[in-house]
Amino acid sequence: MKMILALVVLGLVLVAAEDKYTTKYDNIDVDEILKSDRLFGNYFKCLVDNGKCTPEGRELKKSLPDALKTECSKCSEKQRQNTDKVIRYIIENKPEEWKQLQAKYDPDEIYIKRYRATAEASGIKV
């Protein structure tokens, strides 16, 4: 009986762990990436399938569709903060790149409609 209970608990822990994105890259300096046209360009090209991806770029690219679909429900607080920062930066400073990202990840404008009020409440004009 104890063995079965231990297996059930282990299973629940593993399922709970899968319900969050990895925090392995949470300490990346997002400001440094946004300040550098080269670094920003590399990540952007990765996301739109026009360039190679770093390991963290691959992880972002893999998680992005699910994060949009689930309203970032699996994101850590740091990931949410960085997401807001990056979206604000791209909208304000890289409108052409924003259009390309929207075309790839939200061509039917499903997510942008859902997030518009939340974004604008945070001071992000979408």
Swiss-Prot record:
GO BP, one annotated term: mating plug formation
Superkingdom as given in the UniProt entry: Eukaryota
Signal peptide from the UniProt entry: 1-17
Alphabetized UniProt keyword annotations: Behavior, Secreted, Signal
Pfam families named among the record's database cross-references: OS-D
Gene Ontology CC: one annotated term: extracellular region
Disulfide bonding pattern of the chain: none
Tissue expression profile of the protein: Specifically expressed in the ejaculatory bulb and seminal fluid.
Annotated localization: Secreted
Entry-linked SUPFAM superfamilies: Chemosensory protein Csp2 (SSF100910)
Chief place of localization: secreted
The protein's role, per its UniProt record: Protein component of the posterior mating plug.
PANTHER family named in the record: CHEMOSENSORY PROTEIN-RELATED, EJACULATORY BULB-SPECIFIC PROTEIN 3-RELATED
Family per similarity comment: Belongs to the insect A10/OS-D protein family.
Protein name (database record): Ejaculatory bulb-specific protein 3
Source species: Drosophila melanogaster
